[in-house]
Amino acid sequence: RSFLEFAGQMDCAQTALYLSACNIPSKEAHGRVVEFLTEPSLTALLQQPDTSKPKDLRNLVFMILMYDTAARCSELLDMKVCDLRLDAKHPIAYLHGKGRKIRTVPLLSKTVQHCKQYLRKFHPSTDCHSEAPLFFTVIHGTQQKMSPDTVAAFFAKYGRMAKSVCPEVPEHIHPHMMRHTRAMHLYQSGMPMVLLSQYLGHSQVETTMIYAHADTEMKRAAIQKADAVRGTKPVPDEIWADNEEMILKLSGLL
C-alpha cells in the first residue's frame, strides 16, 4: 500500500489502484508468543555444563550472566572485561544496547562469584580496565570474540541434555529465550512495567507489554484447565424433580 500510495503521488493515474488496495482488509495479526523457561527448566539447563571443563565453565557463566542481566546475546558478546564492576559496593555490569545506548544492570552476589571464577580462569593476567572481549574463543592461537553461532550451539546442546531429565524443558532452546525468561520471572515477581522496560533497555513501554499479555494468557489457560476438570464432575440429580410436594414446600405454598 505504501508503494501504491507513492506511485499515486508520482502518477495520478495510479491513484485509483491505490484506493482499491486500501479496501482490501488487512490480515489479522496474531500476538507474538513469548518463549521462556519455568524455574525447573532453568535449573535443569544450568545443571548441564561440566564445570571441570574450561569451555563448559565459560558457557555456564555466559548463561548465568545472560539470565541475571536479561541481556541480548549481542550485548553479552560485545561485553569487555572493563564492563564488569565486580568489586564495587554494588556490583554492576555495563551493557551496550541498541542505538549505542549503555545501561547499567545490578548483579546478584552468586553471579559475581561465578564471574570472578571465570575471570581467574580465562583472564588471569588481564587488568580489570582491559577492553579485551569478556567471552572469547581461540582460533589458530588467537583470541577472538565469541560468535553467535557458538552460543546457539551450546544452548541447543544443553537444551537437549536438560530435556532428557526435565520434561518441562522446551523442545528447542535458543539464547534469546534466556532474556524472555528473566523478564517473565521479574514481571511475575512484581517488578513494575516501567522499571522492567528500563531494565530490558526497551525504548517504549509498549514493547515490554508482551510479558503482561503472556502472563495473562497463562492465567487464562490455568482457569480454562480448572473449568475443564470441574466440567467432568457429574451434575447432581434434581431431588425435587417429579416431587410436587417438595416443590410446593420450596415455594412456600405448603
Q: How should these model regions be labeled?
A:
Residues 1-254:
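Conserved catalytic core of the tyrosine transesterase superfamily
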